[in-house]
């Protein structure tokens, strides 16, 4: 805490960005800016579909639909959490004793109840800011969802989506709110590299470690099942499209000359992914003699994550280099996850943890804070050109600050994720699915998609003798249990000794005890 206070005091003497989304809307954001944020949020929400396709395409076909449903739940329950508490925790009133660490107020967001004197424009800007920030918040829970693929109850996922959104909201206050502790210290995080990707990545890593690997994932003859590579790549393309809005709109506005920063961010984002793509193709070709689908996707996603930290500042050559380095670091983490036997189905660790760490370090090296217009001078929205990266004479202050933010937010996310998982695990809801659900697939157990499940599973395994025998054995055992249970319930019911409902309960208990 003393270190944090000393850093805060030191930064109080430094010029920094001053941007407050609520209190000075009349002199900073116009109707055009509100439309810009609203339209961008619509595009960002398409990333949810992309994440769903990517995740379902990279897991076993017996869990494809379940993965898509989880991503739907991320928006449902994550969005509800952000409306109820998240927005207030991030952008609520900071004029209190703990104002630098958490916002308070604006819970159950509703601009209509604040003041009847507010203009229509002010209310419109508030609505557009809410939907824009909500699109970022639900992305965080989607990242965590990917780390738990094929192992978690759907009902448990509802609670995780809700609470992870609140974890993100507090971190967002530190980084984005005008009075946030790291914002006051001068942190550079243009588009949620720490508040979205580091929070989501670390939480997802904790989740996959807590749940332990999928059955037979690291067995002697275990394999990584991929149900539909085409679907996974289509999902990546949708994410890539959404990421352009994710980064470009993080300047909040297109007026007062601010549109230039958005255009710089758009060019930097696409060039970062291009640089990362070139490096990824070279690495996967040299290491495997092929262009591996999962390595291509993860390498390019890591380059996009790396670009989020300083996307509003990076010049084209800087963005290309940052993306290339981000991809190489992420792919270097691949063997580490296998060696440590971390079952990470969609690459949450290399993409979002490694990518976000480098994405936060990169601005400390490359950023040159040229004067940027964020509204009229009387609004105090000008940025500073005095705290630059190492390449531009900024010294080590920004590098130390960015590293400190990584450490604090990473630790905070890990602790919160563990507490959430622990409480759900030891509650009546439960956390991990049983072994039969995992074998048969959540599509069958949770959604009743038996025919589709069995058909695609056999195609996925190419119907070799061993696989066919295993699949048939599982189906036969499941049907035998169902038939035996029906016969026993009928016999008990005919004898009149036990009510049918009680007989069913007794039978299920017998089956669970046996297995």
UniProtKB/Swiss-Prot annotation:
Keywords per UniProt: Ammonia transport, Membrane, Transmembrane, Transmembrane helix, Transport
Membrane topology: Multi-pass membrane protein
Protein role: Involved in the uptake of ammonia. Implicated in aging.
Matches recorded under Pfam families: Ammonium_transp (PF00909)
Transmembrane parts of this sequence: 34-54, 72-92, 124-144, 156-176, 191-211, 226-246, 266-286, 291-311, 321-337, 346-366, 381-401, 404-424
The organism's taxonomic lineage, starting at the top: Eukaryota, Metazoa, Ecdysozoa, Nematoda, Chromadorea
Subcellular location: Membrane
Xref: InterPro entries: Ammonium/urea_transptr (IPR029020), Ammonium_transpt (IPR001905), Ammonium_transpt_CS (IPR018047), NH4_transpt_AmtB-like_dom (IPR024041)
Main location: membrane
Gene Ontology MF terms: ammonium channel activity
Record family assignment: Belongs to the ammonia transporter channel (TC 1.A.11.2) family.
Gene Ontology BP annotations: ammonium homeostasis; ammonium transmembrane transport
Superkingdom of source: Eukaryota
Keyword Flavoprotein: no
Cellular-component GO terms for this entry: plasma membrane
PANTHER family referenced in this protein's UniProt entry, alphabetically: AMMONIUM TRANSPORTER
Identification of the protein by name: Putative ammonium transporter 2
S-S pairs: none
